[in-house]
Curated annotation (Swiss-Prot):
Coiled coil: none annotated. Contains an N-terminal DNA-binding winged helix-turn-helix domain and a C-terminal regulatory domain (or effector binding domain) resembling phosphoribosyltransferase (PRT) domain. It comes from Methanosarcina mazei (strain ATCC BAA-159 / DSM 3647 / Goe1 / Go1 / JCM 11833 / OCM 88) (Methanosarcina frisia). PROSITE patterns: PUR_PYR_PR_TRANSFER. GO terms for biological process: pyrimidine nucleobase biosynthetic process; regulation of gene expression; UMP biosynthetic process. Belongs to the purine/pyrimidine phosphoribosyltransferase family. GfcR subfamily. This is Transcriptional regulator GfcR. GO terms for molecular function: DNA binding; orotate phosphoribosyltransferase activity. Keywords: DNA-binding, Transcription, Transcription regulation. Transmembrane segments: none annotated.
Length: 204
């Protein structure tokens, strides 16, 4: 996407296809606040100032299995480097739905680990207090295991925090988080190290 008008058009298109705010945010790799602003602006309502956010379009990687493979190898290398410091092995690679799944499954294969899938509550617009995401029962178990969390982009860190908390409640041990792009710029979230191929730091 080249400009703000493209983002607005894509947000409206996704909304018209039935996606909720959280799902649109996931597709465009922006915050929910940015999606709300884009949709409000599309209706030509009185515009509030634009939120400070950065849209990340990594579709040139996502559309190619070969590119995904090579990126997953780079992410594996970062995981190994991080876990060697504590002499820890990876038991399970947890992919955050939807965009973390292809990378996580390739990484699990490369690392010789099980693969688990996490459905975030972010995809739901009407989140009830206390409502949590879920680990799919169709994939690997995380209980008592060393886990690496894989997602595409960290924006605010709320989804990452949600996954970490859920894993700990299931007696799993989150050991690292790896992403393509970190827009938050944190070294850790809930004492779990964050590794990213690209870290974006906004200078205002």
């Amino acid at each position: 996407m080249k400009n703000i008008e493209d983002l607005i058009q894509k947000a409206v298109e996704l909304q018209n296809n039935g996606l909720g705010t959280g799902q649109i945010a996931d597709e465009l790799n922006v915050s929910r606040e940015t999606v709300t602003w884009l949709l409000t602006r599309s209706k030509k309502e009185v515009a509030a100032p634009a939120p400070k956010d950065i849209s990340v379009n990594w579709s040139s990687i996502g559309k190619s299995a070969t590119r995904l493979h090579y990126i997953s190898l780079a992410l594996c290398d970062m995981v190994i480097e991080t876990l060697e410091k504590t002499n820890t092995e990876v038991d399970v690679v947890v992919g955050v739905a939807a965009s973390g799944i292809p990378l996580a499954s390739m990484m699990a294969n490369e690392l010789g680990a099980d693969f688990a899938l996490y459905h975030s509550r972010k995809g739901q617009d009407m989140v009830q207090p206390g409502q949590k995401g879920t680990i799919s029962r169709n994939f690997g178990s995380v209980a008592g295991k060393n886990c690496v969390i894989v997602d595409d982009v960290i924006t605010t860190g709320s989804t990452t925090m949600e996954v970490i908390e859920q894993l700990r409640e299931m007696d799993a041990k989150p050991r690292a988080v790896v992403v393509l792009v970190d827009k938050k710029g944190a070294d850790t979230i809930a004492n779990v190290p964050i590794q990213s191929l690209v870290r974006i730091v906004r200078v205002d």
